[in-house]
């Protein structure tokens, strides 16, 4: 690890599986190194995968197989901006279809418990519109969604 700042994500023995899935699912993502434990440790044995260096959409990450003590929470999430409904659907379906869990307003958790937000750019533009009534309509439409539907957001924006 030579980067000055890297996100460290804690896993219970599944860091390589998660990193590989992210690399296969998101553009500009790759698994760059796998480090095996030089000796036994509380949640593993010598030779087990201890850490995995990977990049998710250009963001450097380190997956640490630290054991079952700590879990991911919604306090941390990756937000992915999408350009169209097809991209939104592809990413949403990839994560949810691989054991993920849907939540509200474009949020979901992957099968490892990590939270993600799939946020179409049109939504960000809509809720920050200088027309505050239109922004409110778009916001209220989003509040009733799980996966964001761009056509519904655009219709709400127009009134």
Spans of features found by a protein language model:
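Hydrophobic faces of well-ordered beta-strands that scaffold small-molecule active sites
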Residues: 5-7
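Extracytoplasmic/secreted envelope proteins and their assembly/folding machinery
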Residues: 19, 89-92, 139
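Extracellular/periplasmic catalytic domains that process cell-envelope and extracellular macromolecules
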Residues: 1, 44-48, 55-56, 70-72, ...
């Amino acid at each position: 690890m030579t980067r000055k700042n890297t996100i460290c994500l804690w896993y219970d023995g599944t860091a390589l599986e998660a990193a590989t899935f992210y690399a296969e699912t998101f553009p500009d993502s790759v698994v760059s190194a796998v480090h095996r434990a030089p000796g036994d440790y509380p949640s593993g044995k010598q030779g087990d995968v201890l850490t995995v260096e990977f990049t998710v959409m250009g963001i450097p990450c380190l997956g640490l197989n630290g054991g079952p003590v700590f879990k991911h929470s919604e306090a941390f999430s990756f937000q992915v901006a999408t350009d169209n409904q097809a991209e939104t659907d592809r990413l949403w379906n990839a994560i949810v279809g691989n054991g993920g869990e849907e939540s509200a307003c474009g949020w979901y958790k992957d099968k490892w418990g990590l939270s993600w937000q799939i946020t179409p750019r049109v939504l960000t533009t809509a809720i920050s519109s200088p027309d505050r009534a239109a922004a409110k309509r778009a916001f209220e439409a989003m509040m009733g969604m799980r996966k964001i539907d761009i056509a519904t957001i655009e219709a709400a924006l127009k009134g």
